[in-house]
Amino acid sequence: MEKRWKPGAYVHFTLSERGKTRAIDAPRIQDRQVHKTFTKKVLLPLYTPSMIYNNGASLQGKGFEFSKRELRNDLRWHFRRFGRGGSIILIDFKQFFPSVSHAELLNRHELLIMEPDIKQIADDVVATVPGGRGMPLGVEPSQAEMIAFPSALDNYIKCQLGIKCAGHYMDDYYIMVPPDRDPKEIMKLVVEKAGSLLLTVSLSKSKIVPLTKPFKYCKAKFFLTETGRVVMCGNRDGVKRARRKIKAFHGKIQNGEMTYEDLWTSVNGILAYFEGYNDHRRVLKLRRLFYAIFGFSPEKIENFRMRGAANEVYCAYTFQE
């Protein structure tokens, strides 16, 4: 409040995760202290009341799993009233963080933040990105700004359009349309409303899917059966990565780069991911692969500790190129 703080330069680096490269801007440690306090004490208390419950990103008690769980609940709610009639609209935005308008953010600060000095801090964080567009990934106030930015669109979908089952995780949206309404008209209205916020919908990634067919949301595949059961399967590419990792772990064990305790943690972390889905067959196949390579079951930690104490290395599996 003494007007001595000015945001410093970010540390820029790229992060490649699952084939997607992202540019990350990390703040200095002295700026992180201000960012964290400002986000928790100012931004979130101001923005949270206008957010819908199904906005599941980076909020306490919510997150990636929350968004998938809410979609499953909405599918069950829809089935009890309409069966498998109707459709689901899946929407994704182009360059969600890099393309957001600074003018829209500053207008929101003007509307909600009454104290001039506090508003100046919020404006200074936005101004760290030149060009009048974009917010940095990796900065906590930026994350809070972008979580709340589509709230006008969210409330338009829920209130003006009267859609009960709708939600999103950051820029990944789902909108469940009853059978008595036109999904193309709903999608057109949503795209127009997003355009008024200067958000661009990626038409190549957005689509309308009948609820009788499977669809993907948040890296998971969903299917509503004829009995109303919601089947959720994990990402198929994750199985390929898991198999490569398990094979690589054997080489690390042989070379002494990995302990059996670390092997227990890593393998069961992989299995736990698929156990959270309706993926029993995939879990079973991964356990069989582990047994073929290491010669013991991955379920019990005693198996790992016993071999770690004996410094044993075993392989009954023939790798194929």
What do the PLM-derived regions correspond to, one by one?
Residues 1, 27, 32, 36, ...:
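Right-hand nucleic-acid polymerase module
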Residues 1-20, 115-128:
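Reverse-transcriptase-like RNA-dependent polymerase core
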Residues 10, 167-171, 204:
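Short Gly/Ser/Thr- and Asp/Glu-enriched loop/turn motifs at secondary-structure junctions
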Residues 20-52, 131-158:
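Conserved pre-motif C helix in the palm subdomain of viral-like polymerases
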Residues 39-101:
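Active-site-proximal segment of RNA-dependent polymerases
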Residues 74-170, 174-189, 209, 260, ...:
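Conserved polymerase palm-domain catalytic core
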Residues 113, 191-199:
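A common structural junction motif
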